[in-house]
């Protein structure tokens, strides 16, 4: 029989509490409220200061019988919620409103009227965690004691009056796939709520999110129609927003938003707290390229947060608020016949009192497209279909109708080509779609979202500067007829080029308004905020760590090693620190190659860097291969309570590493393979296996 070691004992202990934690839906490892998140609602929110947080009261005040709540991190769930609200109103006559989960309370949902319905569109973030705006909602319904205002207990089925619809957005490359919607749905069922239709699940990992959503909603509408006796009618476009051109204002008017994110930025007096709703315009202290090979660039940037009251911890994320490239702004304005009036000032107002205006107003067409709209995003088949009524001719209309109704044809002509909306329409006809109301574009195109990067510095070493390590995206994907260029990384490359003396930066042929609205970003500034992460070093620096981070997945581990080197320099005991790093070639894209030598001098034998170069030998070698080669080392460190970290690609690398680790544990301990897999799962639940991955 295999001898029990420390890891086995830890796993046995975890088995006792892990099962309880699992069946209480993750309460024990639920993400804490983000300390960097905004304490107030977003601009134009439905529940502004002084307004009610009682959703039942709000629905009664505004005459609504359907609320669509969303928990969204990148804007997709919010977009789906808006689409459901619009479709419910136009097709079925529902009186709909969209609601941000963090803007309302939940203690009175046991009093939700039986003649109304609530939708919950819930994204899962990271390893089964709620999105930032859904943390309190998640904790309320999945906690041990759900306390409603009426005092009703769970045994009394307090949500028996609540009719609800649920759809989740997840990624099957993560272990806890669609955990948010599954756990909330289970909690609602336990509390007696009545779900209408099935709880839908969209899979971003398989690239089928949009089609999953479209396939789910039709039977859902049928079930809801039967439950609420709804009558379907022909859907005719009814604007959610009223967009008017204001000839009395010019772009030079100080009240016109030209890209400023908030009113205080517009007025030239930005102030904290800086958050996901209020970025800090941060100076870039330093920028350089770690490597440049053909169309591949990798950037290192130092962003100063001095004087902002922003703080971060090693392992956190920084969010960069991008600007759309000039070529894409021009393309969009040309396709929709707005090129000649790009500087016209427009006012945007919600026709319904509950509608949240996603763009600061007044603004201009140019500013809206450049700074506020995700015009380079993948195209929704449902949105393309709505444009048929506004096509410039019958031939174009017929093509759009076919694209909207035939998912295989749409996949061939649009999805495979990686077209954004303007590119898709350009492929149909050279005629402008001038008849498309700008209100429809605001409704159908999501708000331009910040992009998140793992911080590659230690807050102990440089508390006022944040490092970013990012590969610039400019790739030709299989099937695409053009280069697909990253919105934010090319923007950052342009900033780097400008800072380093290029008077006319044009990364991969793109140009940007580098100085920002009204030159407020002059001097090389970029809007940022910080987001908390659970990806953290052990509190005890003597505890061993094993890190697996190929490519830019090494970013947070640079911060980890930087921190441990600083602690060692102060005389603190630092445990074994092992990094598995992979790249193509040692002389091409070995990130921070010289810097590791400095840390090696500081940490001595406590730092071990094991490399995998995939294109130097006859066989491709990846980090998971090196991990297997060093099975004994990995096993020995796990026996010493090592924490295991993975950062990088979720779809392939992270899955392979997870599999190999289970095999290592089983082989080194003489256990069945399934026991090794089980032990890795319990390492995850105990926090000794952590991931910071993306797909």
Swiss-Prot record:
Q: May I have one GO cellular component term?
A: mitochondrial outer membrane
Where would I find the FAD-binding FR-type domain in this sequence? 277-538
Q: Which UniProt keywords apply?
A: Cell membrane, Endoplasmic reticulum, FAD, Flavoprotein, FMN, Lipid biosynthesis, Lipid metabolism, Membrane, Mitochondrion, Mitochondrion outer membrane, NADP, Oxidoreductase, Steroid biosynthesis, Steroid metabolism, Sterol biosynthesis, Sterol metabolism, Transmembrane, Transmembrane helix
Query: Where FMN is bound, by residue?
Result: 72-77, 123-126, 169-178, 204
Q: How does it sit in the membrane?
A: Single-pass membrane protein
Residue sites binding NADP(+) per the record = 296, 552, 614-615, 620-624, 656
**Matching PROSITE patterns, A to Z?**
FAD_FR, FLAVODOXIN_LIKE
User: Under the GO molecular function aspect, what terms does this record hold?
Assistant: flavin adenine dinucleotide binding; FMN binding; NADP binding; NADPH-hemoprotein reductase activity
Location within or outside the cell:
Endoplasmic reticulum membrane; Mitochondrion outer membrane; Cell membrane
Q: Name one GO biological process term.
A: ergosterol biosynthetic process
User: Catalyses which reaction?
Assistant: 2 oxidized [cytochrome P450] + NADPH = 2 reduced [cytochrome P450] + NADP(+) + H(+)
Outline the inducing conditions. Expression is induced in the presence of benzoic acid. Expression regulation is particularly complex, involving regulatory promoter elements, differential promoter use and regulation at the post-transcriptional level.
**Which parts of the sequence bind FAD?**
451-454, 469-471, 486-489, 694
Coiled-coil annotated spans: none
Query: What's one Pfam family the UniProt record gives for this protein?
Result: NAD_binding_1
What enzyme category does the UniProt record give? oxidoreductase
Q: Which HAMAP family match?
A: NCPR
Which family would the database say this protein is a member of? Belongs to the NADPH--cytochrome P450 reductase family. In the N-terminal section; belongs to the flavodoxin family.
What does this protein's UniProt record list under function? Answer: This enzyme is required for electron transfer from NADP to cytochrome P450 in microsomes. It can also provide electron transfer to heme oxygenase and cytochrome B5. Involved in ergosterol biosynthesis.
Protein name as annotated = NADPH--cytochrome P450 reductase
Which species?
Answer: Aspergillus niger (strain ATCC MYA-4892 / CBS 513.88 / FGSC A1513)
């Amino acid at each position: 029989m295999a001898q029990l070691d420390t890891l086995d004992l830890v796993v046995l202990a975890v088995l006792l509490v892990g099962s309880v934690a699992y069946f209480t839906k993750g309460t024990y490892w639920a993400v804490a409220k983000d300390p960097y998140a905004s304490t107030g609602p977003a601009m134009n929110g439905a529940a502004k200061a002084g307004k009610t947080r009682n959703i039942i009261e709000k629905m009664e005040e505004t005459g609504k019988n359907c609320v669509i709540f969303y928990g969204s991190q990148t804007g997709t769930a919010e977009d789906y919620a808006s689409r459901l609200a619009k479709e419910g109103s136009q097709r079925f006559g529902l009186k709909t409103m969209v609601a941000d989960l963090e803007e309302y309370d939940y203690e009175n949902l046991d009093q939700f009227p039986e003649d109304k319905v609530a939708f919950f569109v819930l994204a899962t973030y990271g390893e089964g965690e709620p999105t930032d705006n859904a943390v309190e909602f998640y904790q309320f319904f999945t906690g041990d004691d759900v306390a409603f205002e009426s005092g009703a207990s769970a045994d009394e089925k307090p949500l028996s009056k609540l009719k609800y619809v649920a759809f989740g957005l997840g990624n099957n490359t993560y272990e806890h796939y669609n955990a948010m919607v599954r756990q909330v749905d289970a909690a609602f069922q336990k509390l007696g709520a009545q779900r209408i239709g099935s709880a839908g699940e969209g899979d971003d990992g398989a690239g089928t999110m949009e089609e999953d959503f479209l396939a789910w909603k039709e039977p859902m509408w049928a079930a809801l129609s039967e439950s609420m006796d709804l009558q379907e009618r022909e859907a005719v476009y009814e604007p959610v927003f009223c967009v008017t051109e204001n000839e009395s204002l010019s772009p030079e008017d100080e009240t016109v938003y030209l890209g400023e994110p908030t009113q205080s930025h517009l007025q030239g007096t930005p102030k904290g707290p800086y958050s996901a709703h209020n970025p800090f315009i941060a100076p870039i202290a330093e920028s350089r390229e770690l490597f440049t090979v053909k169309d591949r660039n990798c950037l290192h940037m130092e962003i100063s947060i001095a004087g902002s009251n922003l703080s971060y911890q090693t392992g956190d994320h920084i969010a960069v608020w991008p600007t759309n490239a000039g070529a894409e702004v021009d393309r969009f304005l040309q396709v929709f016949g707005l090129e000649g009036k790009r500087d016209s000032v427009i006012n945007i107002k919600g026709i319904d009192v509950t509608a949240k205006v996603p763009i600061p107003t007044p603004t201009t067409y140019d500013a809206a497209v450049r700074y506020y709209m995700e015009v380079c995003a993948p195209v929704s088949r449902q949105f393309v279909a709505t444009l048929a009524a506004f096509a410039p001719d019958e031939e174009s209309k017929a093509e759009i109708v076919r694209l909207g109704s035939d998912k295989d044809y749409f996949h061939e002509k649009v999805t495979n080509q990686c077209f954004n909306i303007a590119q898709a329409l350009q492929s149909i006809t050279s005629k402008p779609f001038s008849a498309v109301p700008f209100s429809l574009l605001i409704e159908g195109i999501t708000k331009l979202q910040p992009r998140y990067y793992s911080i590659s510095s230690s807050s102990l070493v440089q508390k006022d500067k944040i490092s970013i390590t990012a590969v610039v995206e400019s790739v030709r994907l299989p099937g695409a007829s053009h280069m697909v260029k990253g919105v934010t990384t090319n923007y950052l490359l342009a900033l780097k080029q400008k800072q380093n003396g290029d008077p006319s930066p044009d990364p991969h042929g793109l140009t940007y308004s580098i100085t920002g609205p009204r030159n407020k970003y002059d001097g090389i500034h970029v809007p940022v905020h910080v987001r908390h992460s659970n990806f953290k070093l052990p509190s005890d620096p003597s505890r061993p760590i094993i890190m697996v981070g190929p490519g830019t997945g090494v970013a947070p581990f640079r911060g980890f090693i930087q921190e441990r080197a600083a602690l060692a320099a102060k005389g603190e005991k630092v445990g074994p620190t092992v990094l598995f790093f992979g790249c193509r070639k040692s002389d091409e894209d070995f990130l921070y190659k010289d810097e590791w030598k400095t840390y090696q001098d500081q940490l001595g034998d406590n730092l071990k860097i094991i490399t995998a170069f995939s294109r130097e030998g006859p066989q491709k070698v990846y980090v998971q291969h090196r991990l297997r080669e060093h099975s004994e080392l990995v096993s020995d460190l796990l026996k010493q309570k090592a924490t295991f970290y993975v950062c990088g690609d979720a779809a392939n690398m992270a899955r392979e590493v997870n599999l190999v680790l289970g095999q290592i544990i089983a082989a080194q301990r003489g256990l069945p393979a399934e026991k090794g897999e089980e032990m890795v799962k319990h390492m995850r639940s105990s926090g000794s296996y952590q991931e910071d991955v993306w797909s």
